[in-house]
């Protein structure tokens, strides 16, 4: 009995689901950044910052700011969405 396709399917599905949850967290952080009253040193905002900042720092500085706004999170979101599409397509083909 070959369990590799089932295991691979489960692994790729888990990575795709994790990427989707992470994308929602990034979008939540970017939406909250528009509100000046959010104190990023209090919970739950501090945890949200600690979870999303390492990933977003990878892309910071890769795109110059436009109109005073940092556009590098867009690159991170596009990369994460590409990963989700790839993992979902590979998962569907291996089923």
UniProtKB/Swiss-Prot annotation:
Name of the protein in its database record: Uncharacterized protein ycf19
Gene that encodes the chain: ycf19
Family of the protein in this entry: Belongs to the ycf19 family.
Species: Porphyra purpurea (Red seaweed)
GO cellular component, one term: chloroplast
Pfam families noted in UniProt: YGGT (PF02325)
Transmembrane segments: none
Broad class of the protein's primary localization: plastid
Domain of life according to the entry: Eukaryota
Entry annotated with the keyword Manganese: no
Source organism phylogeny: Eukaryota, Rhodophyta, Bangiophyceae, Bangiales, Bangiaceae
Keywords: Chloroplast, Plastid
GO biological process: chloroplast fission; nucleoid organization
Cell location: Plastid, Chloroplast
């Amino acid at each position: 009995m070959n369990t590799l396709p089932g295991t691979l399917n489960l692994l790729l599905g888990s990575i795709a689901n994790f990427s989707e949850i992470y994308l929602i967290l990034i979008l939540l952080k970017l939406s909250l950044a528009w509100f000046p009253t959010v104190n990023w040193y209090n919970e739950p905002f501090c945890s949200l910052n600690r979870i999303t900042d390492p990933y977003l720092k990878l892309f910071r500085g890769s795109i110059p700011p436009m109109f005073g706004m940092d556009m590098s999170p867009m690159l991170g979101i596009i990369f994460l969405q590409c990963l989700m599409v790839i993992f979902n397509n590979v998962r569907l083909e291996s089923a």
